[in-house]
Amino acid sequence: MEQDFSWDMLRWQDLYLAPLCLLLVYFAARFYVKKYRNTPIGKYVVPAVTLRLVGAFTYTLVIGFYYGFGDSHNYYQGLIDMFHAVKDDGSMLGNIVMKGKVEETDPLYRYFYYDGTYALKYYILEPRTYNVPRFALPFGLLFNRSFLCVSFCLSFLAFMGTWRLYKMFYELYPHLHKKLAYAVLFMPSTLFWGVSLLKDTFCMAAMGFFVYAAYSVLIKK
């Protein structure tokens, strides 16, 4: 078992991983650009995605060099521990995917216990804490546990959910598309606190998908 304790939010590998990640994010954003090109709301896609990416980078700098410690550090260390668990034993991935919480008797738990931190081995037993790095793990595996790249991917996930919410309001009030864009897509606080390795990011994304799904079933039909 490899010990990897680090709260360095920026690593040398980000020099080549971050541009690659940004390329993939904008490639995915092209789907929205093409789909809504001939609508009044199509022009908001690229700015909404870009501002979230800027917010993710800014958050990484602030949490890494100003605060120096916070919830994101614990989530990130949890992701690193899961990364090494899967690296050591591929079957761990199935265990992480299928289980919504970790117990002290699980083979996975030793990675949190011996990672060099003091508190994480206790925090990670709380499902709400455990599930943040769990849901972010696919991006961590894809980009070699880069915090910045994980943040970029999660910022796009948040955009997807927020866009669904904006689309619902646009369908209800098409004449207010500009004001709705400012209120839903460009709210400053969400561009900082809802674009990285945080519970808020997943909550925003899930809320957008859930609300639009409920609207589609109960109202739009």
Regions found by a protein language model. Name each.
Residues 196-199:
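Short acidic/glycine- and proline-prone juxtamembrane loop motifs at membrane-interface regions
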Residues 63-78, 87-113, 123-135:
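Extracytoplasmic catalytic/substrate-binding loops of multi-pass membrane glycan-assembly enzymes
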